[in-house]
Each structure stands twice: as C-alpha cells, then as structure tokens.
Amino acid sequence: MSQQTTIRKLAELVNTPVEKLLEQLAGAGMKFSGPDQVVTSTEKMKLLGFLRRTHGKSDVSVGAVREAPKKITLNRRRLQEVTVNAGRNKTTVNVEVRQKRTYVKTPESEYHTPTKPPIELGDAERVEILRKLEESRQRNLAEQQRLAEVDRQRVEEQERKRLEEEQAELERQKTESPVVEEVPVQSDSNSVKPVSKPISEDRTRALPRAVRPAPAARPSVSRSDDRNSNSGVRHKPRGSHVIVSDEDDSARRFAGQMHLTAAERARRGSNTRGKGGGSHRGATHRGNENSIRSSGAHGFERPTAAVVREVAVGDTITVADLAQKLALKSGDMVKALFKMGVMVTITQTIDHDTAVLVSEELGHKVTRASSSDFEDALLAHTEEVHGEPVPRPPVVTIMGHVDHGKTSLLDYIRRTKIAVGEAGGITQHIGAYHVETPRGVISFLDTPGHAAFTSMRARGAKITDIVVLVVAADDGVMPQTKEAVQHARAAGVPLIVAVSKIDKSTADPQRVKNELLTESVVAEEFGGDTQFVELSAKTGVGVDALLDAISIQAEVLELKAVIEGRATGTVIESSLDKGRGPVATVLVQQGRLKKGDYLVCGTHYGRVRALFDEVGHQPLAASPSIPVQVLGLSGVPDAGDDFVVVDDERLAKDVAQQREAKRRESRLVTSAGNRMEDILAQMGKGENQQVLNLLIKADVQGSLEALKQALVALSNDDIRINVIHVGVGGITESDANSAVTSKATVIGFNVRADASARKIIEANGVDLRYFSIIYDVIDQVKQVASGLLGVEIREEIIGVAEVRDVFRSSKFGAVAGCMIIEGVVKRSKPIRVLRDNTVVFEGELESLRRFKENVDEVRNSTECGIGVKAYNDVRVGDHIECFERIEVARTL
C-alpha cells in the first residue's frame, strides 16, 4: 500500500463513518477540508494518541509523561419519595440523595520504566494485522450463528411440547369456548450459513432473542479502538453472548402483543429500565430463557366504552366527596357546576337534586342513600310500643281572632285568671292545660290569635283532636278566624264554633253563622255537621254546653292510645330558664313518660330530671294526651319537634348528633343558595337599599319564631330587615359582642340583659330595646326602618297666574301682566311657564310688582306684573305656575 492514505480510505479500514473520523481528527487538532485529503502516518499516530488520552489510556506512543495522578469525580443524584407521618395522616415528601466519589489513578511511570518509542509499522504490516483481525471476527461470527441455531432449535422443541400439552388439556376439558392457539415463530430450517448480507430489520425483530444474528462487528486497529467506539455496549464477545440493542430488546419483550400501539410499546419498554436509565444487567447480554415470550401473550387493554358509575348520595354532599365517588377531578366537577349556573367551591355542600343533575350531565347515575343505622334503630324503638289501646282524653285547641275571648273562656273552665296577667291582654305563646271536668279529663291548648303567630296556630291544629273556634258575637268573622278554619281543615280535625260575648248588647250570633257560611262552615240548624255553641266567658252561660259538645265529639272519634311502653309525643313550646336550664313543654301521644327516661327531641337529647304540670306539681309519669314540662335536655328544642324515649344515652346522643350534622349541612346549602339569590337580586338594584340588622332574644321558641317572621316581612325594595341571630333566653355577653360587630339593634322580648352584656352595650352605644307585646315590637321596628329611609323631596304647587298681556321693559325685557287665579305667587319660589298645559320653561322670578311697587307675594284674584329671569318668550294665555319643594319623611 502506498504511504499516502485518504481520510475516506482510513474510515473504511477502521470501519468508522467519515463524518465521525473528521470530528475525531478535528478534536486532535488537525483540520481537514474533505474526506479525499491525505493522512500521513504521523497524523495517524497523533490521532491514536488523542483517542487513547480521551479514554484514559497512557499515551506511550506519543511519549507523554504523566506528572500528576489522574482524578475523576463522579456526582450522582437520585430522587426518591419518603412517607412521613404527620399526625393522623401521611405525607409523601420528595428527597434528593446526592453522592460524590473521587477516583485517583497513579501514573504508570511510577511503577514502570519508560518504554521505548513504538516501532513504526508500514502499511503492509498494518494491512496484515487488519486481515488477521477480520478472520478472527468471521470465526467468532460463525460460532455465534451456530450456537444461535442450537438455541433456536431448543426453543422450538420446547414450544412444540408446550403446545401439545395445551392441546391435550383442552381436549380433556372439552370446553366449547373458542381457543386462540399460539403459533410458534417460523424460521428457516436450513442451517445458518455465513452471512453475506445483513438480515432485514423486520425479520430480525420477529426472531427470538437467542436466534437473532449478532450485528456485524466493526473492524478495528486495536482493542483500545474497540473501547473508544461510541457503542453503548462494551464487553468481550464470548461464547453465545448476543449483542442486542435497546430497540431490539424492547421489541423482543413485546413481540407477541400485536394489539399494542407503538406508544404503548415505548412506554412499557421504558418501565423495565432502572432508575439510571440503563437496562438491567443480563437483559442484553444473556439469552435468558424466562425472558422469551410466546407470540400469544396478552396485555391489558384500555376500556373503549364510557364507564357509567352509580353512586348513592344522601340529602347533601360536598363537591369534593361527589367528585371522589364519581372518580373525577374536583376541578372538573366545579367546572360542570359552573356551566350549570351553580357557583361553588370544592368544600361547599350541594343538595341531592343538584348532585343528580350534575351527575347526569357527566354521564353517571345517582341514587338516594338509605337512612342511617341510628335512624333505623330509633324507628325500631318507636315501633316497639306494645299493649292494648285504651281510651284517652281528647286534645282540644282553642283558636280564633285576637281579643275574641279565647283565654277568658279557658280561664272560666279552669277557674283561673290567666288573661288578667298576660301582657297587653293577649296570648303570645301556646298554653297547655288539662282539666278534670264532670265529663272526664280534657286537655286544652290555647293558641295566640295575632297574625304573627300563624305557624304556632298551624302547629296546634296538627297535634289536636278537636278545634274550638271562638268568634266574638259583636265582631264577627275576622282574618285570623278564616285562617283558623283553614288550619283545621288542612289538619282534618272536626270543628266546634263557640260564639262568645253574647252578653253584650251589640251581640249578633246570627251574623256569625251567616259569615261562616262563606267559609263552608255550615251549622247543624242549617243542615251542616258543625256544632255552634253560644256562650259568655264572663257570666258562664253556655260553657257547660260547650263541654258537652266536646265530650260528644270525642266519643264519636273513639280516641285510643297505648298507655304502657316507651313514650312518644310532640314539643308544644320550649324556653330557657335561668335556674332550670332548657325547659320543653311536651304533649305525650303514646306510652308513658317517666322521670329518668332517656329521650331524643329533634337535635337535642337528655335524661328527664323532672316533670312539671301546669300548676307546678311534679307527677311521677305522664300518660297520653297529658301536657307536661320536661327538664334535663341538652338544649332548647324547636317547637313542633317529635320526641322519642330510647333505652340508653349513647343511642340518644348519636341520633341527636347525626341530626345536628344533617341540619348543619342543609343550612349550609340553604345559605349558599341565599347568597346566590342575594347576589342576583342586588345586581338589578342600586346601592340605595338600606339594611337594618336585628338581634332577637325571646323567652320561648314560639314567640321567637313569630317575631322573626313578622319582622322579616317588613322588608321591601328600599330597606331590608336582616336578622343576624335569634335565640331563646337572656341577652348574654356574646350577644352583645355580636351586636357591636354587626351594628345591630338588640330586641329583648320578655327577657333582659345580664350585667356583662349591659356593660358592653353601654360602652359601645348599642341600641337595646325591651318589649313584652308583639304589637310594640313591630311598630318600633317600623319607625327605626323609616328613619333609615331618609326624606323624600316633593313639589307642592302654591299658586297659578294667567298671562293677560305682555309689556316690554328695557331693564327686564318681556314683562307679563298676570292675574292670580289660584293660590299665591311668591318672589323667592321657583316657577314654570305652561303653554297649552305643557311645560315650556322652568326657572325663577326676576321681578314681582304691583302698582310699580316690588312685593314679596301676590294673592288670589290680584293683578301683578311678573318678570321671568332669562326668558322673553312669554305669550298671552300662558300660565305661570309657582311651586315649592318640601321634604317628607318616608315610611314603610
């Protein structure tokens, strides 16, 4: 070979791409413009020394001497997750582990004497060496192909035996299901001959790993050049070791899963690699038998159809919990609710209907969750009342218009004087009494007649057996009388009409009967089924006849109840006593209520510490239809709540707490809805609406409910009554602080503030008002609300002048000669000029004269001259209207 070798020829000799060889020459400090340039032997040795230095070999050929030991520092970083206990929960923390190692290599010159310079080899010797290396490579390749053929035959034999065993097993089972047989990989049965051309890529991937031919080895000048190559695999070809690239290895692992996409193949292939990104040891160096998968291997498939979930939801649920049940992201759930017009966050609560709508919008189904175990246990308790029903006393509710004599009638029956001691002479809460008469025991409920106590009257009609409608003979049918008839009809209870005050000279019982005909209440004498009794609570006339009518009606109804077992009933009224705590007036409807019983009453529970009747006695037990006061509850229950006696306090507490949680969730849903309604309502209104904040405390729950409803009803477009807090009992320090914060007016209905509350109220100037009559509360709140409305500017016409003639003045211009036809015209008041009853100008007077004298006012039927300021178009027949603006206080 000639001494001159081009770069292209050298690249073919060392089996390296021309571009890469040019890069290596450039890295060694030699610049070449093209692959056809000549490379000398010196430049070849310089390139060889550069490659050795690059890969850490001693450059003895160049004669370089290492003065200092070589150091190499390896920095390694690893990311891992550590689970940390944080209280009751666990938190995952990302931790970065950093490792640094330094390796020091001592120069070979310290252990060996300097070697002699290498002998320069000619091109002929170099070609001989390359030829021997090529022959060695061909021998190794032939050996590898022979071993690969042996491995292939062994694998095919194993596959054939396995298929025969599976076929025999399937025949034994005689199943009718279709069987997908695994087809072994077909390969050339001929012996592998020396490869003359590379195997196609598709065929290579289809072969098992042990059968694949190794890629052609590149010829190299020496072993060090083999190490200097950029291949990712650095090992000695020995025995049956097969070099498999990462791409071929990934294809081998999933060669049988034909349904996988290329992206899934890449993803699954990447999952088998180690943390450092390299493949596992031995996966690419040894033909492992276990790693060879059959062509029939099956993988996981992603569902093609939409997944429809069916979840159970109670009355309320938070947005985050609903998203978790539906396996959705909370953000997607909030977005879907926003599209439906519901603005919520992930922590807010939505009701069952909203959950159903949004779930159907997202393609899922929602069912109503079953009742809780506690409620089921409570229901089982109520159904365990056994015994023979026996007759019980009737429960009679006295209803009617205010001041028609309901309480006076009950006083006469009970031989008491309750009406005299009531504030304002009107009843403001339900009174429950039982009276022993010659005709048996009768329980009476006295309801208020004021319009504000509608819900209280409806509650009385719900738990009663008979309604006695009291109508004054001198007043006739009034609005609350009609309302009482509607309540009785809605509750489905019989009605007895008591026409009271017949001792008055203006009494007209016949008028009452005729007016009630319009309400479909027909007396017996008119062919109806309603009993009418005329009486006087003052003289006692007709009271016995009323008791007889009640007894007859009770016998017709055949009222019965079980008097033994656990008691159940209804709360009539409740209050907070300073010395006794929460006090509830209850009416027993089934069973027997005894001292020491555990009972659940709405969201409250407790043990009966004491029982009191209406006169203050402490009975040992209360039978059906007997009202009593109960002490020992955990809080003040709402009027109208049902109570149930249970076995132990644990069950009572669990049921009460669960009910409180449900009520709180419902309240949150309602408040969220109210906030939305407030926002939408305020969008259409200006900022002129005033707000009056109120804090109401009352003696009993029924009065509190009536007060809140009556005061909130006073709101209109100009002012809104906002009740920030209501409660039963005295005004406490926390109530005073709430009033200071919200700038609210405190209303105490039959209650007073304690010393600490009074101190805060006086220090901050809070408006505190005490009341005992509901009329006064409503009137005072109306006055306060009217004061917030401010004043209204109104225009009042005080005089009209008719223009009879027009004069010209050098000083004032056009002057109108007028006759006052109505009222009085004043100089200081504004005026309007009307032409054909249409306003053409509005301004003020510049001059008002009578007989050439300036005057302040001119009265009716008097002539005068009027000069209108900045207006000269006054005509005969116009009217000049004089008016004044006055301020008028606004009222509700």
Swiss-Prot record:
Q: Which gene encodes it?
A: infB
- Feature: compositional bias, Basic and acidic residues: 165-175
Record's Gene Ontology CC terms? cytosol
Q: Name one Pfam family in it.
A: IF2_N
CDD domains in alphabetical order: IF2_eIF5B, IF2_mtIF2_II, mtIF2_IVc
Task: Name the keywords, alphabetized.
Answer: Cytoplasm, GTP-binding, Initiation factor, Nucleotide-binding, Protein biosynthesis
Chain segments annotated as transmembrane = none
User: Where along this sequence does the record place binding of GTP?
Assistant: 400-407, 446-450, 500-503
Protein's name according to its UniProt entry: Translation initiation factor IF-2
Please tell me the species this chain comes from: Xylella fastidiosa (strain 9a5c)
Molecular function terms, GO-annotated: GTP binding; GTPase activity; guanosine tetraphosphate binding; translation initiation factor activity
Q: Give the source's domain of life in one word.
A: Bacteria
The record's comment on protein family reads: Belongs to the TRAFAC class translation factor GTPase superfamily. Classic translation factor GTPase family. IF-2 subfamily.
